[in-house]
């Protein structure tokens, strides 16, 4: 089980990303379309003025059962340990143990 403070921090980041998504996207589009270097510099400063945690790449994929940050399978949202135990118990529909 991950520390509750780290899970809470990640939840806080997700809320910030949602809140600033439109503003961040419009600034990035304006930055890409700007030709004048001074205009680009001004837009870049506005992007830098946004909160650091509103960038989507700062969100960590976490297991929804345990909150572990590593070894998380995107398809299931589970860490490898939980995926294995739930697959063995038959709690994941369509997942069968491989045998040949």
From Swiss-Prot:
UniProt cross-references to InterPro entries, sorted A to Z: Ribosomal_uS14, Ribosomal_uS14_bac/plastid, Ribosomal_uS14_CS
Highest rank taxon of the organism: Bacteria
Molecular function terms from GO: rRNA binding; structural constituent of ribosome
GO cellular component: cytoplasm; small ribosomal subunit
Pfam families the record matches: Ribosomal_S14
The keyword Zinc-finger is annotated on this UniProt entry: no
GO biological process: translation
Keyword Kinase: no
Parts forming coiled coils: none
Biological role stated in the UniProt entry: Binds 16S rRNA, required for the assembly of 30S particles and may also be responsible for determining the conformation of the 16S rRNA at the A site.
Subunit structure: Part of the 30S ribosomal subunit. Contacts proteins S3 and S10.
Family note: Belongs to the universal ribosomal protein uS14 family.
HAMAP family: Ribosomal_uS14_1 (MF_00537)
Protein name as it appears in the record: Small ribosomal subunit protein uS14
Organism whose genome encodes this protein: Prochlorococcus marinus (strain NATL2A)
Gene: rpsN
């Amino acid at each position: 089980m991950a520390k509750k403070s780290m899970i809470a921090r990640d939840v806080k980041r997700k809320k910030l990303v949602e809140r600033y998504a439109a503003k961040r996207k419009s600034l990035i589009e304006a930055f890409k379309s700007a030709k004048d270097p001074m205009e680009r510099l001004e837009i870049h400063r506005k992007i830098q003025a946004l909160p650091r945690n509103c960038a989507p790449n700062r969100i960590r994929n976490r297991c929804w059962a345990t909150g572990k940050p590593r070894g998380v399978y995107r398809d299931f949202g589970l860490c490898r340990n939980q995926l294995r135990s739930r697959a063995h118990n038959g709690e994941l529909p369509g997942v069968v143990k491989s045998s040949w």
